[in-house]
């Protein structure tokens, strides 16, 4: 994948030398790469400052037209043989990819119907972006596209995106998660003004990741990279992104401004998604989610409840989550707040952020960190370790299995008079008496609870005999900190 990038007008005979080639040559070094932050990486990917508003006109909204011409003739303008029209599946995924870019930035796309066009006259098409296929056994490129403001030989060659089916048949069968969809999103990125993170194009003795301009040049961070996500410690298990990633969002918003109308309501990402967007939606435990969230408001949720693997779910902007058995495959763009997270069947680690979070562990032995904010934390079944954080936090228990005597939860930082332990659902749904009665010792009656505190270890223990079958508790929570039975419980 790639683009040819013209600094000045050149003859058409030279343009073919600037197109993508299939060979990539690696020349690794021991160079220590600098790290680029979110803004720096975004500006670097957009370093040509080329938009559909003009060269060096950045940060302004744009209206961009596109088309799928019915190509005719033996060549396109770059000397590639047998141009022909996108098929319907390609058109579908091109539209989805365009939507993905406009989702994050102030770009309005309008499709224009275009009829038969000689490939040698592609620059005469009156739309900003044109898509086409090439069947050229002599060509060596997989796909290429031109930036806005690309001129050569007296022609405006801006916004042309060409895809070879001879050297990569997957270009004509794009699906979410495959390389064909990644290729489309990548090439559209070029047509909107994005560069590769380094000054490389396939076929130009590409030096390899270790000679990148900066450490985050990989497909963990940007769809514009040539380098696989594992170069930076991620692992997508053979899947590819189908939408802009973390640094792509930064880059495109630098060029066109942020789309602040995108998803201002209460949105769910993952299982039970209400976004209507394929790359934000999981419906099966085998789905592979790869996305970076841009969201403009509301009370929003990461729902990864349908996955069985151990997961790391991190709601802090700029950080990465390990979701559904993949590593570092989900992130949150800067200036975006996701308030809630739901874990799955594995042993999950969940980090909240500065907002008032609702954090749900689900099944498994989970570790939850509320950080700041006034959080609601529900570990769910399993032996969970719960850190409320600095705010006023509520720890919820709904059933006996949430904290068994043999696998008790541990609340690590309880603050008496500030935090609460909510047993109301547990009492109403489990106790025949519907009442929690604190006692010094169990007497065999249902609904009895004991609460002890060790001043030396600063540890409390809540034990409950829910059913009254004997003198032993069914439910227990270990708590770091003093707990007042009169004020610290919701019953």
Curated annotation (Swiss-Prot):
Gene name as annotated: zapA
Keyword annotations from UniProtKB, A to Z: Calcium, Hydrolase, Metal-binding, Metalloprotease, Protease, Repeat, Secreted, Virulence, Zinc, Zymogen
Stretches of the chain forming a coiled coil according to its record: none
Activity modulation: Ca(2+) increases protease activity.
Binding site for Ca(2+) 3: 344, 346, 348, 361, 366
Positions of Hemolysin-type calcium-binding repeats: 342-359, 360-377, 378-395
Name of this chain's protein: Serralysin
Co-factor binding details: Binds 7 Ca(2+) ions per subunit.
Annotated residues for binding of Ca(2+) 5: 362, 364, 366, 388
Subcellular location: Secreted
Family matches, as SMART domains: ZnMc
Taxon lineage: Bacteria, Pseudomonadati, Pseudomonadota, Gammaproteobacteria, Enterobacterales
Gene3D superfamilies, per the entry: Collagenase (Catalytic Domain), Serralysin-like metalloprotease, C-terminal
GO cellular component: extracellular matrix; extracellular space
SUPFAM superfamilies: beta-Roll, Metalloproteases ('zincins'), catalytic domain
